[in-house]
Amino acid sequence: MAIGKIVKSDSHINYVCQIFGPHETDIQPVPAEYAFGRFVRIAVRPQSQDGADDLYDEVLGQRQPVSYAVGVIYNTILQNPAFGVLGPRLSNEMQVELFSPDYVTERAILTYIMVLGMMEVQPLAGGQLEVLSVMHGIPLLSLSLDSEVETMDDEMVRQFHYFRDPAGGVGTQEPYLHMGYIPHIIAQHSSLLPMVTLRIIDQLERLFPQHLALLSIVKRNFAWHLKVETTG
């Protein structure tokens, strides 16, 4: 589900998403869909591709692979320019909405997203997606302004964390749990990122019960290091 669009970037891996407000989309996102620690994806479009190409491929029944940047929401800002502004107001909010329906409100919910890696998926019939490749780390391409931010369901989050490497030779692949973005998160300067890391581990414990013992060790070690750094 689309929850908003990219309106700004602070770096190559940190982006600001403005959550869709009333009348901006058919289904307005609820707070749980842009909660702290929520995994999201943003389509990365090559420069040569446009909407006409997508329509042409759809008519021919051809579906090209799509690359997504995968990120996590780690901060939320409520923007209200009217706060602290003194003086009389000629109209209240209800009157403005009634008599000036084209008025653009400046209030917004902004979420900060840190990109953790990339996924390439192949759209299939029936709206299903087949994951072709996964990468953890810094992507080569940046996102575009106004790109839609979509939530990821549990299955997509699992696919993002399950790597498959040839183990016993050609044709044999053993899947394993991978969190290659952890050093990438730790290197950033934000007081909220360590907490979002713990939140990510909590989610993975639910999604990968077979790896509960391993994830519990990782969480305890990370929480201990966080406590040591906080207390100095």
PLM features: residue spans?
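Short, well-ordered loop/turn sites that connect or cap secondary structure elements
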Residues: 31-35
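Short beta-strand/loop turn elements enriched in aromatics
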Residues: 1-17
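Short beta-strand-centered aromatic/proline hotspots
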Residues: 3-7, 38, 50-78
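Charge/polar-rich, low-complexity and marginally structured segments
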Residues: 102-232
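Short alpha-helix capping/helix-loop boundary micro-motifs
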Residues: 15-30
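Short, solvent-exposed secondary-structure boundary/capping segments
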Residues: 14-19, 79-96
